[in-house]
Design a protein with these regions (language model features):
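Short alpha-helical DNA-recognition segment
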Residues: 30-50
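Short C-terminal boundary/hinge segments that cap the last helix of small helical domains
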Residues: 60, 68-82
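The alpha-helix within a helix-turn-helix
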Residues: 26, 37, 67
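Residue-level signal for the short linker/turn that defines the boundary of a DNA-recognition helix
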Residues: 20, 30-31, 43, 58-61
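A short, Lys/Arg-rich alpha-helix, primarily the initiator
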Residues: 2-28
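Residues within the helices of the helix-turn-helix
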Residues: 23, 34, 64
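Residue-level recognition of specific faces of alpha-helices
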Residues: 47-50, 62, 76
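Residue-level detection of the helix-turn-helix DNA-binding "recognition helix"
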Residues: 27, 41, 52-55, 82
Length: 82
């Protein structure tokens, strides 16, 4: 079983579940990869695209920014009950 640096626990949360939520929230707001990259201060749309597609693991600071853009708590993306 593959675990990334955060050591996701099997069956609790996976990077794929986070990615699906990121994509769903972005599409719900009719935002493109380029829009998200601009909102996050990235020069290239591929930087955000790599996060959403799971090629790059997002840092907590990035997840906080994304949560703010989507008006969601960070815990929403991790299925945490706070």
């Amino acid at each position: 079983m593959y675990y990334n640096k955060i050591r996701w626990e099997k069956g609790v949360i996976t990077i794929e579940k986070i990615n699906k939520k990121l994509r769903a929230e972005r599409l719900k707001r009719n935002l493109t990869y380029e829009d998200m990259a601009n909102l996050l201060g990235y020069k290239s749309r591929s930087t955000y695209m790599y996060i959403e597609r799971g090629f790059t693991e997002p840092r907590l600071e990035v997840m906080k920014k994304i949560a703010t853009i989507f008006n969601k708590p960070v815990s929403y993306f991790f299925n945490l009950k706070v």
